[in-house]
Design a protein with these regions (language model features):
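Short proline/glycine- and acidic-rich turn/helix-capping motifs at secondary-structure junctions
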Residues: 52-63, 71-78, 155-167
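Short, flexible, solvent-exposed loop/turn segments with mixed acidic/basic and small polar residues
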Residues: 8-16, 110-119
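Glycine-rich, aromatic-bearing surface loops/beta-hairpins
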Residues: 120-168
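Surface-exposed, low-hydrophobicity interaction/linker segments
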Residues: 59, 63-108
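Long, low-complexity, intrinsically disordered terminal regions
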Residues: 1, 6-9, 14, 147, ...
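Short, well-structured beta-strand/strand-turn elements
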Residues: 43-55
Length: 168
């Protein structure tokens, strides 16, 4: 009697999960100063604070305290040693919760990069959900009008090798 082994392969495409727009910002300012100037030049009022420990259904979230303090935390294991990287994050939601804006620092507190293939960008502005092309161009121009901003450019997240770092 012969046995037949069947193999199941699951091909997961990250591109189907990338439902956001990504803007790269090169700027020597600290993150809180950049947030101040973005709110001054546009209508986006970023907030950095503690995330609710309870979700909208009343259940406790399965996140550790570092993640609740509006950090993105990534763990890497090298030679049986676990290292954590903490990236600061600021958030803004409009009144109707149609848009979510996240300002992410490309450099962690420990010195590692969130998107290692784009080391020249200091920050990333991630916009979840749909935004009109004209509104997007206007937002990029508003960011470019900040005197300390050297470069603001829309990026294609599907072309990035470390795009999974932007899914949270």
């Amino acid at each position: 009697m012969s046995t037949v082994k069947k193999h199941l392969t699951i091909d997961f495409d990250f591109d189907s999960e990338l439902d956001f727009i990504l803007i790269g910002i090169s700027c020597p300012l600290r993150d809180y100063r950049l947030c101040h100037f973005i709110s001054k030049y546009s209508s986006i009022e970023f907030v950095r604070g503690k995330e609710d420990y309870i979700d909208h259904k009343g259940y406790a979230k399965e996140k550790d305290k570092d993640e609740m303090d509006f950090h993105i935390v990534y763990e890497k294991t090298k030679l049986k040693k676990v290292s954590k990287s903490h990236f600061s994050m600021y958030r803004y939601c409009d009144e109707n919760f149609e848009f979510e804006y996240y300002l992410l620092n490309n450099r962690s507190i420990e010195g590692t990069l969130l998107i290692s293939e784009l080391p020249n960008f200091d920050y990333f502005l991630l916009i979840k959900h749909y935004i009109d092309d004209e509104d997007l161009r206007g937002l990029i121009e508003e960011i470019k009008n900040i005197p300390e901003v050297l470069l603001a450019k829309e990026l294609d997240p599907s072309s990035l090798k470390s795009k999974e770092n932007l899914i949270f």
